[in-house]
Amino acid sequence: AKSVHHARVLIRQRHIRVGRQVVNVPSFMVRLDSQKHIDFSLISPFGGGRPGRVKRKNQKAAAKKASGGDGDEEDEE
């Protein structure tokens, strides 16, 4: 995280896990032996999960454009 505040936001948005447990409480006390198991959640876009809403929308638009246009254009004659 870029700052303490950013870390808090990542935790509240369920992007962080300790071991196999997803943490969403910023005051969660991590034991000393569990510190090495702090990682991004598997369902988080940061941890290799499904891309976020905006990225999926942009990928869909790029695929549509690559396949021959979006169909919204009208021919001007």
UniProtKB/Swiss-Prot annotation:
Give the originating organism.
Nicotiana tabacum
GO terms for biological process? ribosomal small subunit biogenesis
Keywords for this protein: Ribonucleoprotein, Ribosomal protein
In the record, what terms sit under GO molecular function?
Answer: rRNA binding; structural constituent of ribosome
List the biased-composition ranges (Basic residues): 52-63
Q: SUPFAM superfamilies this protein is in?
A: Alpha-L RNA-binding motif (SSF55174)
Protein name (Swiss-Prot/TrEMBL): Small ribosomal subunit protein uS4
- Secretion signal: which residues? none
Q: Is Ribosomal protein among the key words of this record? A: yes
**Family affiliation:** Belongs to the universal ribosomal protein uS4 family.
Q: Which PANTHER family match?
A: 30S 40S RIBOSOMAL PROTEIN, 40S RIBOSOMAL PROTEIN S9
Spans annotated as Disordered: 45-77
- Entry GO CC: cytosolic small ribosomal subunit
Task: Report the InterPro entries cross-referenced here.
Answer: Ribosomal_uS4 (IPR022801), S4_RNA-bd (IPR002942), S4_RNA-bd_sf (IPR036986)
